[in-house]
Each structure stands twice: as C-alpha cells, then as structure tokens.
Amino acid sequence: MKIKTLAIVVLSALSLSSAAALADTTTVNGGTVHFKGEVVNAACAVDAGSVDQTVQLGQVRTASLKQAGANSSAVVFNIQLNDCDTTVATKAAVAFLGTAIGPTHTDVLALQSSAAGSATNVGVQILDRTGAGLALDGATFSSETTLNNGTNTIPFQARYFATGAATPGAANADATFKVQYQ
C-alpha cells in the first residue's frame, strides 16, 4: 500500500514537472539602461556620486525666513574627487553655475518656478569651506583645496537665504559645477 501511494506521488510530481517543462517561454520588453560618464585628462576624476547629487535642505518655517538676509541652518554636502595625482596638480577649486535670484544677490540661486506652489522671496545659497557665499557665474571659484594622492573631498554647505518675507511652497534649485586644477 505504501509503495503504491509512493508511486502515485512520484508519477504525479513527474507529470507536473514535465508540464512545466513544456510551458511556452515568453519575452517582454524591459526598459532602457542609460550609461553616462566622461573620460577626462585631469588631475582627478569627479566621483560618480558627486556628479548628480541631491542636497536635502528639508523643511524650514517661514518664521525663520521672515526678513531679507535671514537664512536657514546650513546643510553640508561634498564633492568627491577620485584617483587624484599630485604630480599633475596640487590644488582644486570649484565654481557653480546657476540662475542667480537677481543682480543684488549673485550668490543666491533662484528657485525653480512651478505654475503654483513655489515659495517666494527665498533662494538657495552655496557656501565654500570658509563659509563664503559663492557667485553662481561659473567663473568664480571656491577657496582652493590642497590635493592628496587618491581620494579627496571638497566640503560645501547650502542654505535657504531670504530676500524678503518668505512665503511657503516648494523651494528647489539647481546648479552645475566645474572643477579647476592647479
């Protein structure tokens, strides 16, 4: 009886596995993978994590930005340089390029405007390691950082900067950067 039951179980399992083996194979489109990069002839290579990063400034109350010149707490972010060779260059500096909020605030990034819901009277200020606000012209470089062979980290800070009484809403801004080696 037990052998007969075992034989039935084994035959059932074999019939199920043969049915699975005969199932049709189906292929579907999956999507696209983008590969981005750049080959450079420079003293260092910018780390992939620094090329396209997001700095989270978080939520800041309008009460903290209620008058021109007020600012939020600064958030640290870094630009990392890899594979540096100090026989090629010993110093690096960074310049940022973006739309300034106006001619009197050339070191404050204008916010991305959306049709509705954007904050007003506020922008984003980028500070170098000395705490100096950086002009957003793409030509004014941060204070120089002395390079070491290998990996180097250049620290920056970002904060909200009020140009008047800030109103609530989305407060996002973008800037590109370039690195100068000497």
UniProtKB/Swiss-Prot annotation:
Keywords: Disulfide bond, Fimbrium, Signal
Cysteine disulfide links: 44-84
InterPro entries with a match to the protein in the record: Adhesion_dom_fimbrial, Adhesion_dom_fimbrial_sf, Adhesion_dom_sf, Bact_Fimbrial_Adh_Pro
Signal sequence, renumbered to the chain: 1-23
GO cellular component terms, A-Z: pilus
Compartment(s) where it occurs, according to its Swiss-Prot or TrEMBL record: Fimbrium
Single Gene Ontology BP annotation: cell adhesion involved in single-species biofilm formation
The keyword Signal appears for this protein: yes
Gene3D superfamilies xref list: Fimbrial-type adhesion domain (2.60.40.1090)
NCBIfam families documented for this protein: PRK15194.1 (NF011741)
Recorded family membership: Belongs to the fimbrial protein family.
Name under which the protein is recorded: Fimbrial subunit type 1
